Amino acid sequence: MLRGLYTAAAGMISQQRKHDTITNNIANINTPGFKQGNAVSRSFPEMLLAISTGGSDSPVASAIGRINTGVMAEEDLSIYLQGDLQETKNPFDLALVSNIQVPGIAFDGAGKYITPEGERIYRPQAFFTVQDVNGENRFSRNGRFTVNAGGELVTPEGYRVLGQDGQPVVLVDNADPANPVLLADATIGPQGQFLDAVNGQPLNDVNGNQISLLISRVENPNRLIREGNGVYRLNEEDAAQAVPILNMNDQVRVEQGYIERSNVDPTQSMIDMTAALRAYETNQKMVQFYDKSMEKAVNEVGRV
């Protein structure tokens, strides 16, 4: 009887975790570049039940069968499907469009490929590279940038956007002190490079290097850890997962004057949330049933 109680309780915890994930998805429908989460559940290992027969000196096990002891919410995976683009005409709004292919691998609609051996391979994803207040690199698809008091391109959280030289992008280029260029008036090309708005020529920094955004390719995006508002980080041991994209091709491009909308489907999210709530209520009723059964066993069976 207790096994059934534990199974129902585990189901309640799993559905609560799923409900929390869906609620977070719905709350971020209007967050640019947000990628919806998916609570992955898996069953506990099966138990082989047997009954011992015979004397204490020579017990013989008679198999009854297998029983599953419930499910658990194992992890929360992000679904990195490309979001729709929304035009804003704001020059500091940038959207990443990526469809990175890996030779010899055909990803499914969710960006996943399962090898014949059962190994899961996920489609690499492209991200803007930003620097937090502690100088640590972070990754984001939220391209709704602004300019801070120091003339730097920053995220809504105040994180500085990095260029390919690994330094924050400053919107005033003083390569020629006699004729400084205001990068706020520049255009940003599909490869993330800053171009002169008049002649379309690349703009260079004080060292003569072309000014371009640092776009990183994360080989396994499911190694990323959410920090909120579409910002992710990698653990130190996973730092090698992120590599700069120095020569962008048609698989990755930057669109100026657009933002990438969240890829959350509000209709499907409401359906999933309702289903999770119903499953939670069902497990709750089973817990109440087992509770009443045990109460009867304790208080009434002994009277017989």
Predicted segments — roles?
Residues 1-167, 171-176, 181-304:
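Amphipathic alpha-helical polymerization modules
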